[in-house]
C-alpha cells in the first residue's frame, strides 16, 4: 500500500512538468493517478473520501452539466464534452488523499519540482528572448 501511495504522491508532484510537456502527458497522469487512487481507496476501505464536502459539491455541479447536456439539441456532442470532467473531481480527491497521507513530504517534493519547473521555463523564456529560439520547445 505504501508504494501505491508513493506512486500517487510522485505523479501528483510531477504534474507541473507534465503540464508543460503537453495535454497528453498531463491527462495520462490524471488517469493513472485516478486508477491508483481508486485502488488505494478500495483496498483500504476508506470510503469517507467520497463523502467529502468538496466531492459532493463537485457531483452536484457535474450533474448540472449532464442535465444541461441532455437538454441541448445535439445530445451526443454535448455529452462528449461534459462526461470526461468527472476525472478532475476524482483527481481532486486523490490530491486530498495524498495530502492526508503525508503532508510534509508532499509539500516538500511538490514545491521543489514547482521551483525547478518555473526556473527552467524562466531560463528558457529569457534564452528565447535574447537568442531568438527556445530550448524546451
Say what each PLM segment does:
Residues 87, 111-124:
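Transmembrane alpha-helices of multi-pass, membrane-embedded glycan-processing enzymes
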Residues 90:
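Phosphate-binding glycine-rich loops of NTP-binding sites
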Residues 120-137:
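Membrane-interfacial helix-loop-helix modules of multi-pass inner-membrane proteins that assemble, modify
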Residues 1-80, 97-115:
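Transmembrane signal-anchor hairpin modules in multi-pass inner-membrane enzymes, especially those
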Amino acid at each position: 500500500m505504501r508504494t501505491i501511495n508513493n506512486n500517487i504522491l510522485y505523479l501528483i508532484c510531477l504534474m507541473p512538468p507534465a503540464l508543460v510537456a503537453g495535454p497528453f502527458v498531463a491527462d495520462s497522469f490524471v488517469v493513472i493517478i485516478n486508477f491508483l487512487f481508486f485502488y488505494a481507496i478500495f483496498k483500504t476501505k476508506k470510503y469517507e473520501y467520497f463523502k467529502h464536502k468538496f466531492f459532493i459539491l463537485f457531483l452536484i455541479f457535474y450533474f448540472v452539466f449532464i442535465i444541461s447536456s441532455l437538454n441541448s439539441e445535439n445530445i451526443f456532442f454535448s455529452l462528449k464534452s461534459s462526461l470526461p470532467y468527472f476525472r478532475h473531481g476524482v483527481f481532486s480527491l486523490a490530491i486530498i488523499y495524498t495530502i492526508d497521507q503525508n503532508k510534509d513530504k508532499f509539500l516538500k517534493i511538490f514545491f521543489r519540482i514547482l521551483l525547478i519547473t518555473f526556473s527552467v521555463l524562466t531560463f528558457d523564456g529569457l534564452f528565447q528572448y535574447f537568442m531568438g529560439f527556445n530550448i524546451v520547445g
